[in-house]
Regions:
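Active-site acidic catalytic loop and adjacent metal/ATP-binding pocket
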Residues: 1-8, 15-16, 50, 154-201
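ATP-binding pocket architecture of kinase catalytic cores
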Residues: 9-112
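Activation segment
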Residues: 21, 80, 186, 194-196, ...
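A cross-family kinase active-site recognition segment
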Residues: 54, 86-142, 166, 271
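A glycine-centered beta->alpha junction motif in the catalytic cores
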Residues: 56, 68, 72-86, 127-137, ...
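ATP/Mg2+ or Mg2+-diphosphate-binding catalytic cores
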Residues: 135-136, 253-301
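Active-site activation/catalytic loop segments of kinase-like enzymes and analogous catalytic loops
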Residues: 200-233, 247-265
């Protein structure tokens, strides 16, 4: 995808997004309908709504010089500061994130779309698809740690996921997709990984990024989960799979990075969280989380 910021005058700004012609139209339609549905629920934060063209379509076919046909769409621009740019994330910010994710998931509880029933490389419910990449990790100690993370996901998450509540989730709520104003979440962007999943995978994806680099990763997780729980109460079964889901997401992040390094080891955007992912995996392994330890007591939520 290629994105351009469009200044339309009088303070109006939009994002002009060009996508490959091979992007399934059903996925784009799903994103449009999902955002419209969620935005109608008065979330308290903004979503990047897609504007229709003069023909009433959400995409327009274009042809760039020397390129094949592409498709483009115009999206509302949300003015805010990326959470990723914050060097110090406060407890208030983490609680705002937990509430925002819960509000978003509640807004989608009565929404479904056939295109969301899919698999992709970042699908946390299928983290095991990347286990074959273990051989890409040359350091034996790191390879063993990564295998431990996959094993934990297989043993303590995979068998239980089918019985947990399912719905369409955002599935990619990390710092580059969360917009802030002060200490409050004001926007959620990038719906390219939305899929029908166990709802708890929303937290399973987001928590690792909020725990990475934090002096007290357990408290960071507790802040987000407790705020989420107040809006959309979690079951004990959902909480029980959080640690293995976090390990699964970290394993996927590391595995995809290892695969990408074989393609372009100098890419500026592919490896930003890799080192911190290893550090958090070490922390979880060294502190008994593979032996049944939980991030928090359910009673403390």
């Amino acid at each position: 995808n290629i994105n351009f910021l469009v200044n339309a005058g009088q303070g109006d700004r939009f994002v002009f997004k060009i996508v490959d012609k091979d992007m399934p139209p059903a996925i784009v339609a799903m994103e449009y309908e999902l955002i419209e549905h969620a935005a109608s629920k008065d979330l308290g934060f903004k979503l990047p709504r897609i504007l229709k063209n003069r023909q009433g379509e959400i995409e327009t076919r274009i042809k760039l010089r020397k390129n094949a046909e592409n498709r483009a769409r115009l999206i509302e621009f949300i003015d805010g500061c990326l959470l990723e740019s914050r060097s110090d994330i406060s407890q208030k910010t983490r609680k705002s994130l937990g509430k925002a994710l819960a509000d978003f998931d509640l807004a989608l509880q009565d929404f479904d779309h056939s295109a969301a029933h899919r698999n992709h490389r970042w699908n946390l419910a299928d983290a095991g698809q990347h286990r074959s990449k273990l051989s890409l990790i040359e350091d034996p100690a790191k390879r063993d740690l990564l295998a431990w993370a996959f094993d934990l996901w297989v043993a303590r998450a995979k068998p239980l996921l089918a019985e947990l509540p399912h719905q369409i989730i955002h599935g990619d709520a990390h710092g580059e997709n969360i917009l802030m104003q002060g200490e409050s979440v004001i926007g959620l962007v990038d719906f390219g990984d939305c899929c029908f999943n166990p709802t708890i995978c929303e937290l399973g994806v987001s928590l690792p990024y909020m725990m990475m680099g934090n002096a007290d990763p357990e408290q960071a997780a507790m802040d987000i989960v407790s705020a989420y729980h107040r809006i959309r109460p979690l079951s004990r079964a959902e909480c029980a799979v959080l640690v293995p889901l976090i390990c699964g997401r970290l394993a996927v992040t590391i595995s995809v990075a290892a695969e990408r390094r074989r393609i372009d080891s100098d890419h500026p955007n592919w490896f930003g969280s890799e080192d911190e992912a290893w550090e958090l995996l070490h922390y979880l392994s060294d502190n008994g989380f593979g032996k049944g330890k939980e991030l928090f007591r359910y009673e403390d939520l």
